[in-house]
């Protein structure tokens, strides 16, 4: 459960056969990284004759590579519990990801906050692993996911950063509140729902985030909704507005720069109306990854970083590659000129 324990245990029991079936996230707080945890576990098998590993589990498969790197005999590393194996894997370099976050962080003013998007399994990179790396980096103020279940998973994994739920479902509102997750409010009905849920639990000043529709036309309030919104929020003390935000539709393309600025100005007007009407400090944020690079002057109080974490720059910056897809070539064949391959016989 902490560094140094396996060597002591190995000297006591001197196992001759080792079996690895699972390595999870228990006791993660005692290790600097998952790699350090794997290395610690492998020290138990320093003098074993054979190690049997469950090749269906990614962490366990990685242990074999760790053992080779530590100088273990290739012959003792076997894969005996084979029910299902995958020869195509995606490797995620969390150090590179944090370096990319640091690049975007450095484009912002010291007091500007940063939200990182970890929705959809962190775009396939592993929401728990990515979130832990971000939390440990100290570079991030908020995380954001799409639905409540994603936020609950992060809470259970030990993530303590504030988490915004971008698409909160009505049926999940109790779960959101119970797990200290912060819902996006984007319509009259969504505000009524979160107020009712918070009041039912006897809560006061529960943080919510107000979405403004500045031109993307998916979710959000308009300028004409501000009087109703202000009146409703003043009448109910169960919730308080933590931030007001919007989404840019084309911040990554120069051809849409004029529209992007229109969005920003419309959003700013709505946000200022809301702040003055409620007479309270509220964080404002509209810039995404491209916006951070291309519209830095409009960083307001916070920015949201998503695809930029994975090495995508919209200014040509040399960011680090984070994800690598690896596979095994099944076959190499020589085909005569003019012959076709696969269905359709198209050339």
Where are these regions (language model features)?
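Flexible active-site lid/hinge loop adjacent to a nucleotide/diphosphate
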Residues: 1-54
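Residue-level signal for inorganic ion chemistry
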Residues: 9, 21, 37, 59, ...
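A conserved, hydrophobic alpha-helical segment in the catalytic core
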Residues: 13-25, 55-82
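A short acidic, helix-capping loop that chelates divalent metal ions and anchors anionic groups
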Residues: 25-31, 85-87, 251-255
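Active-site-proximal beta-alpha core segment in soluble small-molecule metabolic enzymes
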Residues: 89-91, 112-283, 299
């Amino acid at each position: 459960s902490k560094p140094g324990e396996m060597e002591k245990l190995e000297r006591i029991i001197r196992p001759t056969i080792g079996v690895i079936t699972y390595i999870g996230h228990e006791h993660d707080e005692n290790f600097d990284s998952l790699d350090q945890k794997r290395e610690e576990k492998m020290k138990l098998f320093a003098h074993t004759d054979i190690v049997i590993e469950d090749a269906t589990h990614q962490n366990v498969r990685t242990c074999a590579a760790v053992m080779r790197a530590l100088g273990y005999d290739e012959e003792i590393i076997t894969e005996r519990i084979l029910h299902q194996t995958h020869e195509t894997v995606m490797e995620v370099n969390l150090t590179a990801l944090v370096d990319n976050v640091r690049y975007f962080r450095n484009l912002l003013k010291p007091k500007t906050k940063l939200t990182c998007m970890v929705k959809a399994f962190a775009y396939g990179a592993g929401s728990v692993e990515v979130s832990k790396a971000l939390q440990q980096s100290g570079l991030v103020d908020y995380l954001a996911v799409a639905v409540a279940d994603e936020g609950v998973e992060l809470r259970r994994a030990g993530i303590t950063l504030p988490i915004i739920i971008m698409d909160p479902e009505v049926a999940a509102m109790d779960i959101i509140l119970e797990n200290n997750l912060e819902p996006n409010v984007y319509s009259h009905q969504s505000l009524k729902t979160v107020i009712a849920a918070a009041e039912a639990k006897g809560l006061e000043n529960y943080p919510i985030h107000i979405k403004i529709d500045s031109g993307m036309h998916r979710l959000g309030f308009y300028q004409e909704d501000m009087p109703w919104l202000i009146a409703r929020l003043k009448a109910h003390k169960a919730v308080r507005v933590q931030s007001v935000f919007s989404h840019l539709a084309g911040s990554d393309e120069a051809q849409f720069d004029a529209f992007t600025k229109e969005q920003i100005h419309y959003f700013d007007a709505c946000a200022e109306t809301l702040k003055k009407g409620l007479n309270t400090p509220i964080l404002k944020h509209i810039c995404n990854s491209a916006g951070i690079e291309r519209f830095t002057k409009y960083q307001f109080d916070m920015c949201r970083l998503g695809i930029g974490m994975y090495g995508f720059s919209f200014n040509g910056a040399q960011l680090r590659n984070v994800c690598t897809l690896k596979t095994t070539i099944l076959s190499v064949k020589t085909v005569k000129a003019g012959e076709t391959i696969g269905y359709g016989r198209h050339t």
